Amino acid sequence: MAAPTLGHLVLTHLLVALLGMGSWAAVNGIWVELPVVVKHLPEGWSLPSYLSVVVALGNLGLLVVTLWRRLAPGKGERVPIQVVQVLSVVGTALLAPLWHHVAPVAGQLHSVAFLTLALVLALACCTSNVTFLPFLSHLPPPFLRSFFLGQGLSALLPCVLALVQGVGRLECSPAPTNGTSGPPLNFPERFPASTFYWALTALLVTSAAAFQGLLLLLPSLPSVTTGGAGPELPLGSPGAEEEEKEEEEALPLQEPPSQAAGTIPGPDPEAHQLFSAHGAFLLGLLAITSALTNGVLPAVQSFSCLPYGRLAYHLAVVLGSAANPLACFLAMGVLCRSLAGLVGLSLLGMLFGAYLMVLAILSPCPPLVGTTAGVVLVVLSWVLCLCVFSYVKVAASSLLHGGGRPALLAAGVAIQMGSLLGAGTMFPPTSIYHVFQSRKDCVDPCGP
């Protein structure tokens, strides 16, 4: 087999990155657009709690993929990937005209269209990792780096789009008679939510087109559609050299440095027991951090930020979402292998999380409300909290890599179960019992 040309390799890396861009762009886009839509939908400040539960329920898509593999063994990942991409494109395209439509449910108005389409997109995104990655397993390992780079773009690009859009502005005009606040004056964003969702749809169409391009670019690979073993790039080609380098870089993640040199040790029951305790601790850490970042804290983000204004909420959501891929890139260069270090970072993240939870409990009158210092503190706390927890999750997952596929599977289960438990725990206090309080525009509940 002839060595692929440099142009062929570059194009393949580009298409793989664009494929990764579409993996979580839909759900990330919904999250960063919350500061814009929350003021229009009937759930109000409780909308993030509803969305947390909806995204957690998206893991039901994994059952569908499992059923597909049982009923159609050996069919590969082409059809599931195309179904995921169609659901993502159609879901975001329908969000553009329908996101603001409401309907009565149990005697109360709810944003049925928004939440239903969010569930469809969550099903697609949660299924993407278990369909996209097996497809890429038929390509040489260097292409995985391009895929994860694309996954980072799936968070960064919606954030950039949201920053360009802005969040609008609210002014309270004084009434001429008694000097009290009059009706609020709303200044809109640079473009509406519908335009944002159309732009998000364009990103997903680009990702879907990239997958079709990969199928056309690699027509000689039967493994692309059949699920068989894929061919390797020829030795001596740029891709093969990069693959060897990739394997060398991945080696520290697979075994401790103390065992890298010397003979391979035989089975040791005590070492196995130690690894089990070590692995169980890492899995517990993954479950706790996922419960906090994917369930508990997002459910109260609006209550902790909106008392300081729409801009504070907007910046906390957008910059917090951007902190996630940045932490992942940091972990690729500097990986903490110490359990004590991971515990210390987790405690630091919990400290920020506790501060944010206190702000939410004290809503609508948290400390420093109405001051610039309050805005800076709440935004910085959200960014640092999510950045620290994201780094801990990546580091813990990397340390579990040495356990092979069973360990990574257990890590995925821990992350999803933690997210589901966190979202389910916070839904009753935020959306049913209304433990956290919101406030109306241009009404000061914190005055004397």
Curated annotation (Swiss-Prot):
Cellular compartments annotated: Cell membrane
Residue spans crossing the bilayer: 14-34, 47-67, 79-99, 105-125, 147-167, 198-218, 280-300, 315-335, 342-362, 369-389, 407-427
Record entry for activity regulation: Riboflavin transport is Na(+)-independent but moderately pH-sensitive. Activity is strongly inhibited by riboflavin analogs, such as lumiflavin. Weakly inhibited by flavin adenine dinucleotide (FAD) and flavin mononucleotide (FMN).
InterPro entries: Riboflavin_transptr
Main localisation: membrane
Catalysed reactions listed for this entry: riboflavin(in) = riboflavin(out)
Sugar attachment sites: 178
Acidic residues bias: start-end ranges: 240-250
Signal peptide: none
One BP term from GO: riboflavin transport
Statement: the UniProt record of this protein carries the keyword Nucleotide-binding: no
Keyword Phosphoprotein: no
A GO term, aspect molecular function: 4-hydroxybutyrate receptor activity
Similarity field: Belongs to the riboflavin transporter family.
Name of the protein in its database record: Solute carrier family 52, riboflavin transporter, member 2
Lineage: Eukaryota, Metazoa, Chordata, Craniata, Vertebrata
Name of the encoding gene: SLC52A2
